[in-house]
């Protein structure tokens, strides 16, 4: 009698068939909590569409993939202000950048023509004179965003920039931060808000 040997048997492919489950649409009305969650998600997603334009300026060398994922999570977890259905992202809780460079930003002001002026402190002993100043502005009234990369150097201690299409009554949310010339280091962002 011939012995059964596994090695002599031909191998056959194993086919697994997944039957697609039919989803039956529900006739139930969404709960109040579900409606709130949908509005919050929609608000966060719309802001993310604006904020992601800043990623090329924010990202340091060799950190792009990690930061893109983390950035999305940060926006969705920074909280909301207002009440249903008029929620807004709690912009003050969003730390746009984190890093080891000192930031020392002092103030942001706006004149009647819509020009923003940002000031900061600089001392020679601190080093980093050629760190670049970068700015992200979100106009929550007009739902517009503006990215300004490398608009000044740290040693200049002040810079001004015009926000196109901005009305003096618009609410502006501003994040400003430093980045090293070699794109390897970045500072914590500083948040400012200008009410209309």
Label each region the model flagged.
Residues 1-102:
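Long, polar/Ser/Thr-enriched low-complexity segments
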């Amino acid at each position: 009698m011939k012995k059964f040997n596994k090695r002599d048997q031909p191998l056959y492919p194993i086919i697994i068939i997944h039957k697609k489950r039919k989803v039956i649409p529900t006739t139930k009305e969404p709960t109040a909590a579900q409606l709130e969650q949908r509005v919050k998600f929609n608000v966060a997603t719309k802001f993310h569409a604006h904020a992601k334009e800043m990623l090329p300026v924010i990202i340091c060398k060799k950190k792009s993939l990690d930061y893109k994922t983390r950035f999305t999570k940060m926006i969705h977890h920074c909280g909301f202000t207002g009440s249903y259905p008029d929620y807004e992202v709690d912009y003050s809780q969003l730390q746009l950048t984190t890093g080891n460079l000192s930031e020392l930003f002092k103030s942001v002001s706006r004149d009647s023509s819509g020009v923003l002026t940002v000031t900061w402190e600089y001392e020679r002993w601190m080093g980093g004179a050629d760190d670049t100043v970068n700015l992200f502005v979100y106009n929550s009234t007009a739902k517009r965003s503006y990215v300004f990369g490398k608009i000044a150097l740290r040693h200049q201690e002040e810079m001004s920039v015009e926000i196109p299409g901005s009305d003096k009554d618009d609410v502006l949310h501003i994040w400003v931060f430093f980045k090293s010339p070699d794109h390897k280091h970045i500072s914590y962002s500083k948040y400012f808000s200008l009410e209309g």
